[in-house]
Design a protein with these regions (language model features):
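HotDog/MaoC-like acyl-thioester-processing domains
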Residues: 6, 64-65, 76-138
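A eukaryote-biased signal for short, well-structured alpha-helical docking elements
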Residues: 33-34
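Hydrophobic beta-strand-centered segment that forms part of the acyl-chain substrate-binding groove
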Residues: 3, 37-72, 76-84, 94-99
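Generic structural detector for well-ordered beta-strands
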Residues: 9-13, 58, 102
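Catalytic strand-loop segment that frames the active site of acyl-thioester-processing enzymes
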Residues: 1-25, 132-138
Length: 138
């Protein structure tokens, strides 16, 4: 399968702010995982996908009330039972955060189950993301 990007958008409202008046990191982490999950569920049924690990969130700039954030996600690497999504958050056309999330494909009892998905990267940026994702695996 080729790498397909998915975009979701969020408007920052007053209930999304922290005590500094900027986007609460926990709210952003929630949206971040949701975006990666959507990409993973494009390849497998949602009832078979669980989150294993978020691989770092580094905020390069703050987000404020009224900002609209674009979460661009794509599955860049597939293991035997794992799917690794890359998520980039964009504000005003500029990246403000990115990271990886590992999801596991499970059976209905929650045990890891092979998914038989093969991801093929062709674009240089996707090949680079695949290389970084491989370094995250134990």
């Amino acid at each position: 399968m080729s790498i397909t990007p998915y975009s979701t958008y969020h408007l920052i409202k007053s209930q999304d702010l922290n005590h500094h008046g900027t986007l609460y990191a926990g709210r952003c982490a929630d949206w971040f995982v949701e975006s990666g999950f959507i990409a993973a569920c494009s390849l497998a049924k949602s009832e078979h996908i669980v989150c294993l690990k978020i691989h770092g969130l580094l905020f390069s700039k703050p987000a404020h009330l009224g900002d609209i954030l674009c979460f661009e996600s794509k599955v860049v690497l597939a293991g035997r039972t794992s799917l690794i999504s890359h998520v980039q958050v964009i504000k005003d056309g500029q990246p403000m955060l990115d990271g990886f999330i590992t999801f596991i494909h499970v059976d209905l009892k929650g045990k890891p189950q092979p998914h038989n998905i093969i991801i093929t990267a062709t674009r240089p940026e996707d090949l680079d993301l695949q290389k970084k994702a491989r370094q995250l695996r134990p």
